Amino acid sequence: MFLSFALFSLHAQDNPRITTMDLTAGELAHYMAPGWNLGNTLEAGSNTNNFTNNGGVGAETAWQGTRTTREFISFIKQSGFNSVRLPVSWVMGHITDRSSMVIDEAWIARVKEIVDYCMEANLYVVLNDHWDGGWLEYDGFTTGADVAAKKEQLRKLWTNIANAFKDYDQRLLFAGFNEPGVGAASPEATGNLMFDQYGENDKFVDFVSRLQEYEQVFIDAVRATGGNNANRVLVVQGPLTNFGRTNKYFDITKLSDSAAKRLMLEVHHYDPFQFCGMSEDADWGKVWYYWAGHAPKRASASRVVPDAQRVAIQTAMQELKTNFVDKGYPIILGEYGCNHRTIAPTDGTQAKHDESVKYWYGFSTQYAYEAGIIPFAWDTNNLGRPNMTVFNRSAVSINDATVYEGIFDGDKSGRTAYNAIYPKPSTTSGVMQVEDRGKAPVAVYDVCGRLVASNVASLRKVSLGKGVYVYKGRKVVVK
Protein backbone atom coordinates (compact mmCIF):
# COMPACT_ATOMS: atom_id res chain seq x y z
CA MET A 1 0.00 0.00 0.00
CA PHE A 2 1.50 3.33 -1.08
CA LEU A 3 0.50 6.29 1.10
CA SER A 4 0.77 9.89 -0.02
CA PHE A 5 0.16 12.68 2.54
CA ALA A 6 -0.87 16.25 1.77
CA LEU A 7 -2.56 19.11 3.57
CA PHE A 8 -6.28 18.60 3.09
CA SER A 9 -7.57 21.99 2.01
CA LEU A 10 -9.50 21.93 -1.27
CA HIS A 11 -12.26 19.57 -0.14
CA ALA A 12 -11.79 19.66 3.63
CA GLN A 13 -14.70 20.44 5.90
CA ASP A 14 -14.87 24.04 7.08
CA ASN A 15 -14.77 22.92 10.70
CA PRO A 16 -13.58 19.64 12.27
CA ARG A 17 -16.74 19.60 14.38
CA ILE A 18 -18.70 18.87 11.20
CA THR A 19 -17.28 15.35 11.19
CA THR A 20 -18.31 14.75 14.80
CA MET A 21 -21.80 16.20 14.17
CA ASP A 22 -21.07 18.71 16.92
CA LEU A 23 -22.33 21.97 15.36
CA THR A 24 -25.70 23.43 16.22
CA ALA A 25 -28.03 24.54 13.43
CA GLY A 26 -27.00 28.14 14.04
CA GLU A 27 -23.31 27.30 13.90
CA LEU A 28 -23.76 25.29 10.69
CA ALA A 29 -25.67 28.20 9.13
CA HIS A 30 -22.51 30.32 9.23
CA TYR A 31 -21.06 28.27 6.38
CA MET A 32 -24.12 27.68 4.21
CA ALA A 33 -25.06 30.92 2.40
CA PRO A 34 -25.68 31.41 -0.44
CA GLY A 35 -27.41 28.31 -1.78
CA TRP A 36 -28.64 27.03 -5.15
CA ASN A 37 -31.24 24.45 -6.27
CA LEU A 38 -30.67 21.52 -8.62
CA GLY A 39 -34.25 22.04 -9.74
CA ASN A 40 -36.44 19.98 -12.10
CA THR A 41 -33.99 17.11 -11.84
CA LEU A 42 -34.14 14.46 -9.13
CA GLU A 43 -37.76 15.35 -8.34
CA ALA A 44 -38.94 14.81 -11.95
CA GLY A 45 -41.37 12.22 -13.24
CA SER A 46 -45.09 11.43 -13.37
CA ASN A 47 -47.38 10.81 -10.42
CA THR A 48 -49.05 8.01 -12.36
CA ASN A 49 -45.94 6.14 -11.17
CA ASN A 50 -46.56 6.76 -7.46
CA PHE A 51 -45.63 3.77 -5.27
CA THR A 52 -44.06 1.96 -8.23
CA ASN A 53 -40.52 1.55 -9.52
CA ASN A 54 -41.41 2.73 -13.03
CA GLY A 55 -39.48 6.01 -12.87
CA GLY A 56 -35.94 4.65 -13.11
CA VAL A 57 -32.73 6.63 -13.00
CA GLY A 58 -33.71 8.21 -16.32
CA ALA A 59 -36.19 10.38 -14.41
CA GLU A 60 -33.29 12.75 -13.78
CA THR A 61 -33.67 14.12 -17.30
CA ALA A 62 -37.47 13.90 -17.62
CA TRP A 63 -38.01 17.64 -17.06
CA GLN A 64 -34.67 18.97 -18.25
CA GLY A 65 -32.08 17.44 -20.52
CA THR A 66 -28.77 17.42 -18.67
CA ARG A 67 -27.39 14.63 -16.51
CA THR A 68 -25.66 16.07 -13.44
CA THR A 69 -21.87 15.82 -13.51
CA ARG A 70 -19.06 16.19 -11.00
CA GLU A 71 -17.60 18.96 -13.14
CA PHE A 72 -20.81 20.97 -13.00
CA ILE A 73 -21.27 20.60 -9.23
CA SER A 74 -17.66 21.70 -8.73
CA PHE A 75 -18.46 24.76 -10.88
CA ILE A 76 -21.30 25.67 -8.50
CA LYS A 77 -18.78 25.89 -5.68
CA GLN A 78 -16.27 27.79 -7.82
CA SER A 79 -19.03 30.27 -8.68
CA GLY A 80 -19.42 31.25 -5.04
CA PHE A 81 -22.29 29.11 -3.79
CA ASN A 82 -21.83 27.20 -0.55
CA SER A 83 -24.91 24.97 -0.49
CA VAL A 84 -27.01 22.92 -2.88
CA ARG A 85 -30.62 21.95 -2.29
CA LEU A 86 -31.50 18.62 -3.87
CA PRO A 87 -35.25 18.30 -4.48
CA VAL A 88 -35.90 14.55 -4.76
CA SER A 89 -38.83 12.29 -5.52
CA TRP A 90 -38.83 8.88 -3.87
CA VAL A 91 -42.45 7.73 -3.99
CA MET A 92 -43.02 8.95 -7.57
CA GLY A 93 -41.48 6.06 -9.47
CA HIS A 94 -38.75 4.75 -7.15
CA ILE A 95 -40.49 2.43 -4.67
CA THR A 96 -39.86 -1.32 -4.98
CA ASP A 97 -42.05 -2.40 -2.05
CA ARG A 98 -44.99 -0.21 -1.07
CA SER A 99 -45.70 -2.05 2.18
CA SER A 100 -42.21 -1.24 3.51
CA MET A 101 -41.60 1.90 1.42
CA VAL A 102 -38.37 0.40 0.13
CA ILE A 103 -36.54 2.66 -2.33
CA ASP A 104 -34.96 1.40 -5.55
CA GLU A 105 -31.27 0.75 -4.89
CA ALA A 106 -30.25 2.18 -8.26
CA TRP A 107 -32.06 5.43 -7.46
CA ILE A 108 -30.46 5.63 -4.01
CA ALA A 109 -27.07 5.08 -5.64
CA ARG A 110 -27.62 7.89 -8.14
CA VAL A 111 -28.77 10.35 -5.49
CA LYS A 112 -25.75 9.37 -3.38
CA GLU A 113 -23.47 9.94 -6.35
CA ILE A 114 -24.68 13.54 -6.66
CA VAL A 115 -24.45 14.07 -2.89
CA ASP A 116 -20.87 12.80 -3.13
CA TYR A 117 -20.10 15.33 -5.87
CA CYS A 118 -21.29 18.02 -3.47
CA MET A 119 -19.29 16.68 -0.55
CA GLU A 120 -16.16 16.51 -2.68
CA ALA A 121 -16.65 20.20 -3.53
CA ASN A 122 -17.35 20.99 0.15
CA LEU A 123 -20.91 22.05 -0.54
CA TYR A 124 -23.63 21.72 2.08
CA VAL A 125 -26.62 19.69 0.90
CA VAL A 126 -30.31 19.93 1.79
CA LEU A 127 -31.92 16.64 0.74
CA ASN A 128 -35.70 16.54 0.79
CA ASP A 129 -38.85 14.66 -0.15
CA HIS A 130 -40.19 17.12 -2.72
CA TRP A 131 -43.75 17.32 -4.05
CA ASP A 132 -43.20 13.64 -4.90
CA GLY A 133 -46.37 13.14 -6.87
CA GLY A 134 -48.53 14.74 -4.20
CA TRP A 135 -48.66 11.54 -2.13
CA LEU A 136 -48.42 13.48 1.13
CA GLU A 137 -48.08 17.20 0.36
CA TYR A 138 -51.60 17.18 -1.09
CA ASP A 139 -53.15 13.79 -0.32
CA GLY A 140 -52.14 14.00 3.33
CA PHE A 141 -54.17 17.18 3.81
CA THR A 142 -57.48 16.18 2.25
CA THR A 143 -60.81 15.67 3.96
CA GLY A 144 -60.61 11.96 3.14
CA ALA A 145 -56.98 11.34 4.10
CA ASP A 146 -56.16 8.32 6.26
CA VAL A 147 -53.76 10.26 8.48
CA ALA A 148 -52.61 7.24 10.48
CA ALA A 149 -51.73 5.35 7.30
CA LYS A 150 -49.93 8.39 5.86
CA LYS A 151 -47.90 8.74 9.05
CA GLU A 152 -46.81 5.13 8.87
CA GLN A 153 -45.80 5.48 5.21
CA LEU A 154 -43.90 8.64 6.07
CA ARG A 155 -42.14 6.94 8.98
CA LYS A 156 -41.04 4.03 6.81
CA LEU A 157 -39.94 6.28 3.95
CA TRP A 158 -37.78 8.56 6.09
CA THR A 159 -36.39 5.60 8.01
CA ASN A 160 -35.17 4.16 4.71
CA ILE A 161 -33.79 7.49 3.45
CA ALA A 162 -32.08 8.22 6.76
CA ASN A 163 -30.48 4.78 6.95
CA ALA A 164 -29.19 5.10 3.39
CA PHE A 165 -27.48 8.42 4.16
CA LYS A 166 -26.67 8.02 7.87
CA ASP A 167 -22.88 7.90 7.42
CA TYR A 168 -22.62 11.35 5.83
CA ASP A 169 -21.29 14.15 7.99
CA GLN A 170 -23.05 17.32 9.10
CA ARG A 171 -22.83 18.93 5.67
CA LEU A 172 -25.87 16.84 4.74
CA LEU A 173 -29.21 18.10 6.07
CA PHE A 174 -32.60 16.42 5.67
CA ALA A 175 -35.76 18.40 4.87
CA GLY A 176 -39.01 16.54 5.48
CA PHE A 177 -41.12 18.10 2.73
CA ASN A 178 -41.19 20.81 0.07
CA GLU A 179 -44.35 22.97 0.09
CA PRO A 180 -46.93 21.19 2.28
CA GLY A 181 -50.46 21.99 1.19
CA VAL A 182 -49.34 23.22 -2.25
CA GLY A 183 -49.31 21.41 -5.58
CA ALA A 184 -51.54 18.93 -7.33
CA ALA A 185 -53.23 15.83 -5.98
CA SER A 186 -52.13 12.31 -6.80
CA PRO A 187 -54.50 9.88 -8.56
CA GLU A 188 -55.17 8.34 -5.13
CA ALA A 189 -56.34 11.54 -3.41
CA THR A 190 -59.65 11.30 -1.56
CA GLY A 191 -61.75 14.37 -0.89
CA ASN A 192 -60.71 18.00 -1.20
CA LEU A 193 -58.07 19.98 0.66
CA MET A 194 -59.08 20.30 4.31
CA PHE A 195 -58.49 24.06 4.25
CA ASP A 196 -58.78 27.12 2.03
CA GLN A 197 -55.32 27.97 0.68
CA TYR A 198 -56.35 31.62 0.49
CA GLY A 199 -58.43 31.87 3.65
CA GLU A 200 -57.58 32.18 7.31
CA ASN A 201 -59.95 30.35 9.62
CA ASP A 202 -60.16 27.39 11.97
CA LYS A 203 -59.65 24.98 9.10
CA PHE A 204 -56.26 26.53 8.41
CA VAL A 205 -55.37 26.06 12.07
CA ASP A 206 -56.33 22.39 11.69
CA PHE A 207 -54.10 22.15 8.61
CA VAL A 208 -51.11 23.49 10.55
CA SER A 209 -51.80 21.05 13.36
CA ARG A 210 -51.83 18.13 10.92
CA LEU A 211 -48.67 19.42 9.26
CA GLN A 212 -46.86 19.40 12.58
CA GLU A 213 -48.07 15.86 13.26
CA TYR A 214 -46.38 14.77 10.04
CA GLU A 215 -43.26 16.78 10.81
CA GLN A 216 -42.97 15.12 14.20
CA VAL A 217 -43.06 11.73 12.48
CA PHE A 218 -40.25 12.88 10.17
CA ILE A 219 -38.09 14.05 13.08
CA ASP A 220 -38.66 10.93 15.15
CA ALA A 221 -38.03 8.58 12.22
CA VAL A 222 -34.67 10.16 11.39
CA ARG A 223 -33.50 10.28 15.01
CA ALA A 224 -34.44 6.63 15.58
CA THR A 225 -31.92 5.50 12.95
CA GLY A 226 -29.08 6.66 15.20
CA GLY A 227 -25.47 7.18 14.17
CA ASN A 228 -24.85 10.56 12.60
CA ASN A 229 -28.59 11.02 12.23
CA ALA A 230 -28.94 11.39 15.99
CA ASN A 231 -27.48 14.89 15.65
CA ARG A 232 -28.07 15.75 12.00
CA VAL A 233 -29.66 19.15 11.33
CA LEU A 234 -33.25 18.69 10.14
CA VAL A 235 -35.43 21.18 8.26
CA VAL A 236 -39.18 21.54 8.80
CA GLN A 237 -41.50 23.56 6.57
CA GLY A 238 -43.84 26.39 7.47
CA PRO A 239 -47.43 26.12 6.19
CA LEU A 240 -47.41 26.52 2.40
CA THR A 241 -43.81 27.73 3.02
CA ASN A 242 -45.45 31.16 3.02
CA PHE A 243 -43.96 34.08 4.95
CA GLY A 244 -47.20 35.47 6.36
CA ARG A 245 -48.86 32.15 7.19
CA THR A 246 -45.69 30.89 8.87
CA ASN A 247 -45.31 34.04 10.95
CA LYS A 248 -48.95 33.94 12.03
CA TYR A 249 -49.68 30.25 12.52
CA PHE A 250 -46.51 28.19 12.95
CA ASP A 251 -45.27 27.52 16.49
CA ILE A 252 -42.08 25.54 15.97
CA THR A 253 -41.72 24.93 19.71
CA LYS A 254 -44.59 22.43 19.45
CA LEU A 255 -42.14 20.09 17.71
CA SER A 256 -39.96 18.00 20.01
CA ASP A 257 -36.47 16.83 19.12
CA SER A 258 -34.10 14.60 21.04
CA ALA A 259 -31.17 16.57 19.59
CA ALA A 260 -30.71 20.06 20.99
CA LYS A 261 -30.54 23.02 18.61
CA ARG A 262 -30.63 20.91 15.45
CA LEU A 263 -33.78 22.23 13.75
CA MET A 264 -34.15 24.74 10.92
CA LEU A 265 -37.30 26.17 9.35
CA GLU A 266 -38.01 26.50 5.61
CA VAL A 267 -40.00 29.12 3.70
CA HIS A 268 -40.08 30.07 -0.01
CA HIS A 269 -40.20 33.41 -1.83
CA TYR A 270 -41.72 34.17 -5.25
CA ASP A 271 -43.26 37.52 -4.38
CA PRO A 272 -44.80 39.63 -5.69
CA PHE A 273 -46.48 37.12 -7.97
CA GLN A 274 -47.25 39.66 -10.71
CA PHE A 275 -43.52 40.33 -11.08
CA CYS A 276 -42.07 36.91 -10.29
CA GLY A 277 -44.44 34.31 -11.65
CA MET A 278 -47.44 35.68 -13.54
CA SER A 279 -47.31 34.54 -17.16
CA GLU A 280 -50.05 36.67 -18.73
CA ASP A 281 -52.38 39.52 -17.93
CA ALA A 282 -55.62 38.74 -16.11
CA ASP A 283 -58.81 40.72 -15.53
CA TRP A 284 -57.69 41.42 -11.96
CA GLY A 285 -54.22 42.70 -12.85
CA LYS A 286 -51.33 42.84 -15.30
CA VAL A 287 -47.85 41.34 -15.38
CA TRP A 288 -45.33 43.68 -13.79
CA TYR A 289 -42.13 44.09 -15.83
CA TYR A 290 -40.31 46.77 -13.85
CA TRP A 291 -39.60 47.81 -10.31
CA ALA A 292 -40.33 51.33 -9.12
CA GLY A 293 -37.22 53.42 -9.66
CA HIS A 294 -36.01 51.03 -12.37
CA ALA A 295 -38.65 51.54 -15.06
CA PRO A 296 -38.38 53.41 -18.37
CA LYS A 297 -40.11 56.78 -18.34
CA ARG A 298 -42.66 55.69 -20.93
CA ALA A 299 -43.67 52.52 -19.04
CA SER A 300 -47.32 52.24 -18.09
CA ALA A 301 -47.91 52.41 -14.35
CA SER A 302 -49.75 49.10 -14.67
CA ARG A 303 -46.41 47.45 -15.55
CA VAL A 304 -44.45 48.80 -12.56
CA VAL A 305 -44.16 47.20 -9.11
CA PRO A 306 -44.98 49.68 -6.33
CA ASP A 307 -41.99 49.95 -4.01
CA ALA A 308 -44.25 49.18 -1.07
CA GLN A 309 -43.89 45.56 -2.19
CA ARG A 310 -40.17 45.65 -1.41
CA VAL A 311 -40.84 47.09 2.04
CA ALA A 312 -43.41 44.36 2.70
CA ILE A 313 -40.86 41.65 1.83
CA GLN A 314 -38.26 43.18 4.12
CA THR A 315 -40.80 43.50 6.94
CA ALA A 316 -41.95 39.88 6.60
CA MET A 317 -38.37 38.61 6.68
CA GLN A 318 -37.64 40.62 9.81
CA GLU A 319 -40.76 39.13 11.42
CA LEU A 320 -39.40 35.67 10.59
CA LYS A 321 -36.15 36.65 12.28
CA THR A 322 -37.98 37.73 15.42
CA ASN A 323 -40.25 34.69 15.53
CA PHE A 324 -37.68 32.02 14.71
CA VAL A 325 -34.04 33.00 14.15
CA ASP A 326 -33.77 35.04 17.34
CA LYS A 327 -35.19 32.05 19.22
CA GLY A 328 -32.55 29.64 17.93
CA TYR A 329 -34.18 28.32 14.75
CA PRO A 330 -32.26 29.30 11.60
CA ILE A 331 -34.29 29.60 8.40
CA ILE A 332 -33.59 28.46 4.87
CA LEU A 333 -35.24 30.23 1.97
CA GLY A 334 -35.49 26.90 0.20
CA GLU A 335 -36.54 28.47 -3.10
CA TYR A 336 -36.61 32.01 -4.41
CA GLY A 337 -36.74 33.37 -7.91
CA CYS A 338 -38.46 35.60 -10.43
CA ASN A 339 -39.02 35.09 -14.14
CA HIS A 340 -36.53 36.84 -16.39
CA ARG A 341 -38.57 37.77 -19.45
CA THR A 342 -38.07 38.97 -22.99
CA ILE A 343 -39.76 42.37 -23.21
CA ALA A 344 -41.55 43.53 -26.37
CA PRO A 345 -40.50 47.03 -27.54
CA THR A 346 -44.09 48.19 -27.09
CA ASP A 347 -43.88 47.37 -23.37
CA GLY A 348 -40.71 49.33 -22.62
CA THR A 349 -37.06 48.34 -22.71
CA GLN A 350 -35.26 45.07 -22.09
CA ALA A 351 -32.44 46.83 -20.24
CA LYS A 352 -34.80 48.24 -17.61
CA HIS A 353 -36.46 44.85 -17.12
CA ASP A 354 -33.02 43.25 -16.69
CA GLU A 355 -32.16 45.95 -14.18
CA SER A 356 -35.38 45.26 -12.27
CA VAL A 357 -34.73 41.52 -12.14
CA LYS A 358 -31.21 42.09 -10.87
CA TYR A 359 -32.57 44.51 -8.27
CA TRP A 360 -35.13 41.94 -7.05
CA TYR A 361 -32.50 39.23 -6.60
CA GLY A 362 -30.20 41.73 -4.93
CA PHE A 363 -32.57 43.02 -2.28
CA SER A 364 -34.15 39.58 -1.72
CA THR A 365 -30.73 38.10 -0.98
CA GLN A 366 -29.64 41.06 1.13
CA TYR A 367 -32.84 41.13 3.22
CA ALA A 368 -32.62 37.37 3.72
CA TYR A 369 -29.07 37.70 5.05
CA GLU A 370 -30.09 40.55 7.33
CA ALA A 371 -32.81 38.31 8.78
CA GLY A 372 -30.58 35.27 9.24
CA ILE A 373 -32.21 33.43 6.33
CA ILE A 374 -30.10 31.18 4.07
CA PRO A 375 -31.30 31.77 0.47
CA PHE A 376 -31.36 29.03 -2.20
CA ALA A 377 -31.92 30.32 -5.75
CA TRP A 378 -34.38 28.24 -7.79
CA ASP A 379 -32.96 26.98 -11.11
CA THR A 380 -34.78 24.80 -13.65
CA ASN A 381 -32.10 24.54 -16.38
CA ASN A 382 -34.61 26.02 -18.85
CA LEU A 383 -32.43 28.10 -21.16
CA GLY A 384 -35.34 29.85 -22.88
CA ARG A 385 -37.37 32.72 -21.50
CA PRO A 386 -39.14 33.35 -19.24
CA ASN A 387 -36.94 31.43 -16.84
CA MET A 388 -35.26 31.28 -13.45
CA THR A 389 -32.07 29.65 -14.72
CA VAL A 390 -28.76 30.77 -13.26
CA PHE A 391 -26.52 28.15 -14.91
CA ASN A 392 -26.20 26.35 -18.22
CA ARG A 393 -25.50 22.85 -16.95
CA SER A 394 -24.40 21.23 -20.19
CA ALA A 395 -21.98 24.08 -20.97
CA VAL A 396 -20.87 24.32 -17.32
CA SER A 397 -21.23 28.08 -17.44
CA ILE A 398 -23.31 30.97 -16.14
CA ASN A 399 -26.51 31.24 -18.16
CA ASP A 400 -27.95 34.45 -16.73
CA ALA A 401 -25.40 37.02 -15.59
CA THR A 402 -28.20 39.38 -14.57
CA VAL A 403 -29.55 36.94 -11.99
CA TYR A 404 -26.11 35.76 -10.89
CA GLU A 405 -24.87 39.31 -10.33
CA GLY A 406 -28.04 40.21 -8.45
CA ILE A 407 -27.54 37.31 -6.04
CA PHE A 408 -23.96 38.27 -5.30
CA ASP A 409 -24.74 41.97 -5.05
CA GLY A 410 -27.09 40.95 -2.25
CA ASP A 411 -24.50 38.62 -0.78
CA LYS A 412 -22.01 41.47 -0.59
CA SER A 413 -24.50 43.93 0.90
CA GLY A 414 -25.84 41.53 3.50
CA ARG A 415 -22.77 39.52 4.47
CA THR A 416 -21.72 41.59 7.49
CA ALA A 417 -25.20 41.35 9.01
CA TYR A 418 -25.37 37.62 8.27
CA ASN A 419 -22.05 36.93 9.97
CA ALA A 420 -23.17 38.95 12.98
CA ILE A 421 -26.21 36.68 13.33
CA TYR A 422 -24.20 33.52 12.64
CA PRO A 423 -20.61 34.22 13.76
CA LYS A 424 -17.86 31.80 12.83
CA PRO A 425 -18.05 28.92 15.32
CA SER A 426 -15.18 27.57 17.35
CA THR A 427 -13.28 24.67 15.85
CA THR A 428 -12.49 23.14 19.22
CA SER A 429 -15.72 23.22 21.24
CA GLY A 430 -16.72 19.64 21.87
CA VAL A 431 -13.68 18.06 20.17
CA MET A 432 -9.95 17.88 20.72
CA GLN A 433 -7.72 19.43 18.12
CA VAL A 434 -5.96 16.81 16.02
CA GLU A 435 -2.54 18.04 17.03
CA ASP A 436 -3.43 17.60 20.70
CA ARG A 437 -4.02 13.90 20.23
CA GLY A 438 -0.38 13.09 19.77
CA LYS A 439 -0.02 9.39 19.08
CA ALA A 440 -3.49 8.52 20.38
CA PRO A 441 -5.68 6.44 18.04
CA VAL A 442 -7.95 8.55 15.83
CA ALA A 443 -10.48 7.91 13.08
CA VAL A 444 -10.13 7.73 9.29
CA TYR A 445 -12.79 9.34 7.06
CA ASP A 446 -13.41 9.40 3.33
CA VAL A 447 -13.71 12.72 1.49
CA CYS A 448 -17.47 12.76 2.08
CA GLY A 449 -16.90 12.71 5.83
CA ARG A 450 -18.04 9.09 6.26
CA LEU A 451 -16.29 7.02 8.93
CA VAL A 452 -14.02 4.37 7.40
CA ALA A 453 -12.11 3.15 10.46
CA SER A 454 -11.91 4.13 14.12
CA ASN A 455 -9.20 3.86 16.81
CA VAL A 456 -6.45 3.92 14.20
CA ALA A 457 -3.00 4.47 15.72
CA SER A 458 -1.18 4.02 12.40
CA LEU A 459 -2.35 3.82 8.81
CA ARG A 460 0.16 1.02 8.30
CA LYS A 461 -2.02 -1.16 10.50
CA VAL A 462 -5.31 -0.67 8.69
CA SER A 463 -6.39 -2.00 5.30
CA LEU A 464 -7.62 0.78 3.00
CA GLY A 465 -8.70 0.44 -0.59
CA LYS A 466 -7.48 2.79 -3.29
CA GLY A 467 -8.86 6.26 -2.75
CA VAL A 468 -8.60 9.53 -0.84
CA TYR A 469 -9.02 9.68 2.95
CA VAL A 470 -8.70 12.14 5.83
CA TYR A 471 -6.47 11.19 8.78
CA LYS A 472 -5.30 13.59 11.49
CA GLY A 473 -6.41 16.56 9.40
CA ARG A 474 -4.42 15.54 6.33
CA LYS A 475 -5.39 14.13 2.98
CA VAL A 476 -4.14 10.59 2.45
CA VAL A 477 -4.04 9.13 -1.06
CA VAL A 478 -3.92 5.34 -1.24
CA LYS A 479 -2.67 4.10 -4.58
Regions found by a protein language model. Give the residues of each.
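Surface-exposed, active-site-proximal loop segments in enzymatic domains
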Residues: 47-58, 90-109, 133-150, 182-201, ...
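Catalytic domains of carbohydrate-active enzymes, especially glycoside hydrolases
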Residues: 67-89, 319-324, 365-367, 374
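Active-site region of glycoside hydrolase catalytic domains
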Residues: 148-307, 318-338, 370-371
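C-terminal outer-membrane/trafficking sorting elements
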Residues: 431-479
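Acidic/histidine-rich helix-loop elements
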Residues: 38-68, 96-103, 146, 274-310, ...
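N-terminal carbohydrate-binding accessory modules
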Residues: 12-83
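Aromatic-rich peripheral "rim/lid" segments of glycoside hydrolase catalytic domains that contact
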Residues: 343-433
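An active-site-proximal structural segment forming one wall of the substrate-binding cleft
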Residues: 17-18, 63-84, 94, 98-131, ...
